[in-house]
Amino acid sequence: MTAPIAKLSFWGVRGSTPTVDPATWRYGGNTPCLELIAPDGTQFILDCGTGLRRLGSQWGAPNGNGGAETHIFVTHYHWDHIQGIPFFAPFFAENNKFHFYSFRSKFLGRDSLKQVFEAQMALPYFPVDMSAMTAKRKFKEVEDGDTFTIKENKITARWLNHPQGCLGFRIETPAGTVVYATDNEPGDPKLDENLRELAAGADIFINDAQYTPEQLATTRKGWGHSTWKHGVDLAREVGAKTLVLFHHDPDSTDRMVDSILRNAREEFDSVFAASEGMVITLGSAGDNVQAHMPGARATLRREAQFRAKVTGVTEGGKEFHEETIVRDISLQGALISLQNMPRLQSELQVTMETPGEDGLHSTMHLRGYVVRIDAGTEKGHSAVGVVFTD
């Protein structure tokens, strides 16, 4: 019997506002949007930030006109979690059907999410109003503590600590449990307990990690966000299996996120930093949690043939040393064929021998960062995409 599989895709991972700074391209600049495909085929979308547009462009049918039925959870109404709504092509295809879930805001009253839709598409802020969205839409208000089922999947919603309110969601599927807890500041005992209940035993715990512990203790206190340290401590306390650091600050460069991830991995083994294009698969009861990043190369690479020695860490946490040939390289990175499967978002030490003009070989010592892992062309090998960091 085939084990149930769920697939979680990250389309937007940045917090507060989108960024196009070249120093942030590796993790991505779009604001929050995730997609979860449950084993029974149910499609969930978590938040509608600017990453939603990218999801729409990858929709299965042209223009999104495929008769899809999708469930969308909106955690709260701040700009970075709703900005993608007017640009999501499947909303404009009449054969599609969407179920929306969010809370009643004390500032808006009844039908809060519908009001948010209408307001941000009202003239003169957008060329067309909400009537142009021909897809079928249903809105459901969710309260703190609500539990409900969608086909084979159980959903629980709890309040988190964020200005004007925010919901965290726990989605239990036959393949495992995903907890989405973005935009939360620790420190309120009741709301901290809500988060513990949501995250308990989760296979994937996606947690707000916008600030460093030093920032939260000083200049960012009261802004409604958390840190990698709080996520690690909570994941360990409640027995979450894999932690995903999420909602990266727009001022955090890739190297800053790298540093946050290294700090987190020193204290908790199974940690990833959310990155656009990252896909996490969950096997039966969460026994098989794997993260990978298929996708297009950032720059054009040239064919080459350099001998290389590679040192890194496998997915199981063991150090490996391997000799190989680098056949595909650019100024920014390389595609390396490896028998050992390195951990995604881990560091590789690459020593290459390159020919000089005088016929002699010189040695280059480079530090690389694993950004993607695909099936290799050689049996038993993986094609590992590496970005050079120095």
Q: What residues fall within each predicted segment?
A:
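Cap/insert and terminal regions of metallo-dependent hydrolase folds
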Residues: 177, 187-276
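Structured alpha-helical
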Residues: 271, 287-390
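Glycine/Thr-rich phosphate-binding loops of Rossmann-like dinucleotide-binding domains
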Residues: 54, 215, 253, 281, ...
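Binuclear metal-dependent hydrolase catalytic cores
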Residues: 1-179, 189-190, 195-196, 257-287
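Short, glycine/acidic-enriched loop or turn micro-motifs at the edges of active sites
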Residues: 50, 79, 185-186, 211, ...
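Flexible, active-site-proximal loop/turn residues at the rims of small-molecule/cofactor binding pockets
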Residues: 78, 88, 211, 249, ...
